[in-house]
Amino acid sequence: MNFQSVIAKLHEFWSDRGCLIVQPYDIEKGAGTKSPHTFLRSLGPEPWAVAYVEPCRRPADGRYGENPNRYQYYYQYQVLVKPSPDDIQDIYLDSLRVLGIQPEDHDIRFVEDNWEDAAVGAWGVGWEVWLDGMEVTQFTYFQQCGGLDCRPVSIELTYGLERLTMYLQETDAIAKIDWNGTLTYGDVHLQGEIEQSTYNFEASNPELLFQLFSLYEQEALQLIEKQLVLPGLDYVLKCSHTFNLLDARGVISVTERTRYIGRIRQMARQVAQLYLQQREELGFPLLKTQSVS
């Protein structure tokens, strides 16, 4: 099964179980959790069920395309369901079956691994899912987002699309993944991986990036003051990505790192609080029956 087909199968599977299928959010981010479809919608009492592919950028993970299993740009398949179904593990195993993986024929383990994203004040309890010794999915029951309690608790499933497809295709390198029967993953992304790694570690301008962080922070704060939730979140995400670029460049000390993360987290909390306030003022309009089965 090629990479394109894996995505199509997961879209069909989760759509059939009541999930809204949305498109990737067009701001750089290090994880699908930071999309408003997850970060904001996990808050408050309104039900929500969504699935989407999210391109992720983690500048420090770049290896110029030389590491067969580690890229600084990759894809996650993100699922968020609120409230969490009681049988979510069984539903997940069914999703593997549609990809041709029969759980009874494989060593599938749920390994306890609590998750945290300190920059946006998000954390949860859950597991890594290991398939014959390789991690392919992260299960997280969200406890907080933006430093606010998640009530009810949402379940987030994050599939590692490259790892999952490598397993299905029995290949040993991301670049060798069959994308669509004609082109490989390397045909699509290898040159970009080389150039972006060069940018992340060598060609970026730290002085300019520090200035950009400050400007993005100012813009985020004034948007929050004007009670503009989504534009405010956009600029919080820009701050987060700019911080990651500075971190990859090695120009942020341990002390500075903690301070920068705290600044981002404080803005993320303000956005989350504002979102909840606005939804409450609207009377939480999505409070109606919605289920995933």
UniProtKB/Swiss-Prot annotation:
Q: How does it assemble?
A: Tetramer of two alpha and two beta subunits.
State the PANTHER family in the record.
GLYCINE--TRNA LIGASE, CHLOROPLASTIC_MITOCHONDRIAL 2, GLYCYL-TRNA SYNTHETASE
Q: What is this protein identified as?
A: Glycine--tRNA ligase alpha subunit
Main localization, broad class: cytoplasm
Reaction equations catalysed:
tRNA(Gly) + glycine + ATP = glycyl-tRNA(Gly) + AMP + diphosphate
Give the molecular function GO annotations. Answer: ATP binding; glycine-tRNA ligase activity
Organism lineage: Bacteria, Bacillati, Cyanobacteriota, Cyanophyceae, Acaryochloridales
CDD domains per record: GlyRS_alpha_core
Q: Which InterPro entries match?
A: aa-tRNA-synth_II/BPL/LPL (IPR045864), Gly-tRNA-synth_heterodimer (IPR006194), Gly-tRNA_ligase_asu (IPR002310)
Q: List the disulfide bonds.
A: none
Q: Name one GO cellular component term.
A: cytosol
* Enzyme Commission no: 6.1.1.14
For this chain, the family text in UniProt reads: Belongs to the class-II aminoacyl-tRNA synthetase family.
Q: Which domain of life is it from?
A: Bacteria
Q: What's any GO biological process attached to this entry?
A: glycyl-tRNA aminoacylation
Q: Does the record bear Glycoprotein in its keywords? A: no
Q: Which SUPFAM superfamilies match?
A: Class II aaRS and biotin synthetases (SSF55681)
Q: Where in the cell is it found?
A: Cytoplasm
